[in-house]
């Protein structure tokens, strides 16, 4: 590079982290400038298509300026990127481990992520133009150029990244973030576009008349929905079914499935169901505005949202069940997480309905104390409609999933009480309840003192503490109920799960099923050491009592490091310390 040649040792020493960061930052800058210049030149080239209006916008002088700017950016950025990228690639060729450096993987991942998103959005705009008739006069030259440049940039770096592989832990983590961000984005884009597409079709049905919509059904909004559905679906399919198909052990995959897809679709579905129930109940109570068929316009988005959310939820729930049986060591964990997530969401819906119900009862008490002039006719309709909608959505779900949780306790009480999912669920509810109680008490005491010191009226005091009272009345028994459950779990040793022992099991390979049962009882994994025939198989110890006895003896040992020997009809627990 500087008139001489580097040996492999010299290259390794030269590429320190500081130097590596500098080189990749310069490459990123050069690539951005070069891509911008290429986009400008391609946009001008598209403007030469006969009939394209962009060819005359700004006049000849403007086009010459764009040509000069594009060429200068392309030459400068290309030279900058080419020089430093050539040096980096030379280092990679001489030193293979360099291809797995965290800085390099971060660079490749960021470019792939940015190029993919920019390219897909540009492709959606071009697709809208095609669906709108592909008029040469309205050709989006800039967006077409952006799509081409972003696609070339993405493919080059994606192909390079996949060719080099992802052997290091940082590389796998970065690749996981990249895959699941784009997979999630594609799923959300496709689902939202499909929902709006169905909404457009529903509100254009003839029985609505002209009270809701006007104009043709084939409009730019519908074309945009189709474009988003197509490219969102393609993005989701590529990253979920191709890129993530073998990534079953990744923690990011579990976050994606449980937090984004299952929880997200459940929340969206509950919102849609609650809205439908609320609107229908409100209509039954009467006094709605607008009246007639126009009132049911909400079905245009609520029903599609409910159906799409249900489909997404059902697909990923089935996926969780399939992976649970495909990977038995994660069977209990996967199903357990799903049950507790749904229980938490349904409880939140139920509590919201109860809080509103308590507010209605307090309002009735307030009406009895207030003059009739301060109360509007039919004030209760909206509140009672929302309350009933939340309760109709929350009660069945809560009863179903809470019974599922109680049933799981009867199957494997120790492991269930010690599970992280249960601990997070219980303490999340307890924390929310305690915070709510504290806020309520602060406001009530403040309002009482303020009323006393400022000689305010009783009506003013009532209005100031009403919201705190209605949440306090619901939160207090909720906190008490779940605090009792937590204390009960603690008496069964649930908090011991936070102090996992290092357990090494020496056992014959034929007794693998026994090891799985021991792990289930302990609530965590063990280190398996398979013998080569010296110890007879311990098949006779597979009974529930024997497994519970082994797990209890391991937990009762004071040492955090335990060796477990299992053979034939006996076992031996040996505490040890590493020298």
Predicted features along the sequence, with ranges:
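N-terminal amphipathic/basic-hydrophobic helices that include classical n-h-c signal peptides
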Residues: 1-12
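Hydrophobic/aromatic interaction determinants used to assemble and anchor large protein complexes
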Residues: 10-510, 514-578
């Amino acid at each position: 590079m500087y008139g001489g040649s580097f040996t492999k040792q010299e290259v390794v020493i030269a590429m320190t982290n500081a130097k590596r960061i500098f080189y990749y930052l310069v490459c990123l800058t050069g690539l951005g400038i070069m891509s911008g210049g290429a986009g400008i030149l391609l946009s001008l080239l598209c403007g030469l298509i006969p009939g394209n209006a962009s060819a005359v916008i700004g006049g000849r002088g403007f086009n010459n300026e764009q040509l000069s700017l594009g060429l200068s950016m392309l030459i400068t950025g290309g030279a900058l990127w080419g020089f430093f990228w050539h040096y980096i690639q030379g280092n990679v060729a001489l030193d293979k481990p360099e291809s797995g450096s965290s800085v390099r993987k971060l660079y490749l991942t960021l470019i792939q992520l940015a190029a993919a998103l920019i390219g897909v959005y540009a492709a959606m705009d071009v697709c809208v133009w095609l669906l709108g008739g592909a008029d040469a006069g309205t050709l989006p030259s800039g967006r077409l150029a952006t799509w081409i440049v972003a696609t070339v940039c993405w493919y080059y770096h994606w192909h390079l990244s996949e060719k080099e592989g992802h052997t290091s832990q940082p590389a796998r983590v970065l690749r996981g973030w990249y895959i699941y961000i784009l997979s999630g984005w594609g799923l959300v884009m496709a689902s939202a576009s499909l929902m709006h597409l169905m909404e457009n079709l529903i509100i254009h049905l003839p029985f609505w008349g002209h009270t809701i919509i006007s104009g043709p059904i084939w409009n730019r909004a519908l074309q945009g929905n189709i474009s988003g559905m197509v490219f969102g679906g393609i993005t989701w399919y590529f990253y979920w079914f191709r890129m993530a198909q073998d990534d079953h052990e990744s923690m990011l995959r579990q976050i994606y499935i449980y937090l984004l897809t299952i929880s997200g679709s459940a929340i969206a579905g509950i919102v849609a169901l609650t809205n439908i129930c609320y609107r229908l109940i409100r209509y039954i109570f009467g006094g709605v505005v607008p009246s007639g068929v126009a009132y049911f316009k909400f079905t245009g988005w609520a029903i599609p949202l409910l159906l799409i959310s249900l489909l997404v939820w059902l697909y990923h729930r089935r996926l969780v069940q399939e992976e649970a049986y495909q990977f038995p060591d994660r069977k209990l964990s996967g199903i357990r997480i799903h049950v507790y997530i749904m229980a938490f969401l349904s409880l939140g819906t139920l509590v919201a309905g109860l809080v509103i119900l308590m507010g209605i009862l307090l309002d009735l008490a307030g009406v009895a104390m207030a003059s009739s002039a301060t109360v509007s006719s039919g004030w209760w309709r909206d509140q009672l409609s929302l309350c009933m909608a939340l309760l109709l959505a929350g009660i069945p779900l809560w009863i179903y999933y809470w019974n599922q949780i109680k049933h799981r306790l009867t199957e494997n009480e120790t492991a269930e009480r010690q599970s992280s999912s249960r601990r997070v669920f219980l303490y999340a509810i307890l924390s929310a309840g305690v915070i709510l109680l504290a806020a309520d008490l602060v406001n009530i005491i403040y309002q009482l003192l303020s009323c006393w010191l400022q000689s305010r009226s009783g009506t003013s005091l009532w209005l100031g503490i009403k919201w705190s009272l209605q949440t306090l009345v619901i939160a207090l028994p909720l906190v008490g109920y779940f605090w009792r459950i937590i204390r009960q779990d603690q008496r069964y040793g649930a908090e011991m799960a936070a102090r996992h022992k290092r357990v090494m099991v020496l056992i014959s390979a034929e007794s693998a099923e026994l090891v799985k049962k021991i792990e289930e009882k302990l609530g965590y994994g063990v280190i398996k050491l398979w013998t080569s025939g010296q110890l007879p198989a311990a098949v006779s110890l597979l009974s529930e009592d024997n497994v519970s006895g082994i797990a209890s003896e391991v937990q009762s040992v004071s040492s955090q490091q335990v060796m477990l020997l299992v053979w034939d009809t006996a076992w031996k627990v040996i505490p040890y310390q590493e020298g």
